């Protein structure tokens, strides 16, 4: 579904204010929660290339670079994060180490090269076409795909419906999604990736690592 998402709708929620809040939280606490869990699931990243889709201020990219990744690429649909992302890299001595791009990853997938590791942290729940998003992410992962997505639970689906009613009443075109987990994994499997680990984080999130046969 190329071009299915209006960046204006994303900028309303993922704004400069939210970027500043994320940077402030990182400065105070460092990497926490599901972000930290995903970095742990990455394992040994020495010398690898990383593609982070929807990574916001780039905290996971920074963590993987500090862990030994050779280079990183970011694709973020909201341009409101760019200034704070550059600040974060500069503060830790990594200015110029991340190739940052603004755009819809699915629509722009043909212009983006494959990477060893691809990251989708809390991105699946923000995109309507899960098959296209996860499929392109898997196709771009030479070695490993890391994801965090909502668990398959009834109360999460109910909560998502409530959130979307509120967004509609607020005249915001953005919607959130609770895609079936098996559909997420199937989209990756269609491109040759199989689950290595799946870990639940509290009552909401699940993180997973999926690898390509013979790549590790």
Language-model features: locations:
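Conserved class I S-adenosyl-L-methionine
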Residues: 1-43
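Class I SAM-dependent methyltransferase "Motif I" SAM/SAH-binding loop
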Residues: 54-58
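Class I SAM-dependent methyltransferase SAM/SAH-binding core
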Residues: 59, 63-99
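Short conserved loop adjoining the S-adenosyl-L-methionine
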Residues: 107-112
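A short SAM/SAH-binding and catalytic strip from SAM-dependent methyltransferases
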Residues: 117-129
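A short glycine-rich, Lys/Arg-flanked "PGG" loop and its adjoining helix->strand segment in the class I
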Residues: 132-143
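Conserved beta-strand signature within the Rossmann-like core of class I S-adenosyl-L-methionine
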Residues: 142-151
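Short alpha-helix
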Residues: 174-192
């Amino acid at each position: 579904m190329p071009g299915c998402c209006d960046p204006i709708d994303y900028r309303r929620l993922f704004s400069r204010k939210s970027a500043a809040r994320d940077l402030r939280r990182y400065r105070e606490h460092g990497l926490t929660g599901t972000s930290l869990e995903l970095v742990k699931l990455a394992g040994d990243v020495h010398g690898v290339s990383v593609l982070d889709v929807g990574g916001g201020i780039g905290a996971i990219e920074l963590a993987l670079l500090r862990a030994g990744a050779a280079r990183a690429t970011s694709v973020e649909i909201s341009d409101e994060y760019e200034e704070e992302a550059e600040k974060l890299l500069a503060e830790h001595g990594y200015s110029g180490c991340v190739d940052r791009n603004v755009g819809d990853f699915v629509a722009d997938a043909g212009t983006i090269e494959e990477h060893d590791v691809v990251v989708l942290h809390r991105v699946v729940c923000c995109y309507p076409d899960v098959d296209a998003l996860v499929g392109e992410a898997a196709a771009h992962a030479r070695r490993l795909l890391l994801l965090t997505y909502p668990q398959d639970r009834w109360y999460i689906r109910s909560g998502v419906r409530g959130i979307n009613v509120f967004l509609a009443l607020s005249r915001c075109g953005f919607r959130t999604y609770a895609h079936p987990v098996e559909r997420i994994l199937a989209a990756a499997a269609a491109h040759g990736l199989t689950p290595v680990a799946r870990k639940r984080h509290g009552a909401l999130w699940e993180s997973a690592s999926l690898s390509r046969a013979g790549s590790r």
